[in-house]
Amino acid sequence: MYTSLQSARAFCYRVASDCDQGTVSRKDTASCLMFASESAVKVSLEAIQTLGGNGYINDYPAGRLLRDAKLYDIGAGTNEIRRMLIGRELFEDTLPD
């Protein structure tokens, strides 16, 4: 779980740095959003699994973390839309000039 979160954080920081320098592409930002949201859902599901039945009750924040993480999958464009955008950008990069 730790590795997944740190990987997403490092990727987001790199894309943010590229934005600051003005060298960012749409595929990088879409990839960053997609990877971070999928990592968040995966980690929150693992947290619920680790807690067992307690993961579903409101005494632990794992349930809320999952709901919040899932919102990133569907909010501001779904990950399927992001995949299509990334594929389109990669295809355009391979076309001869």
Identify what each model region corresponds to.
Residues 1-97:
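Alpha-helical interface subdomain recognition
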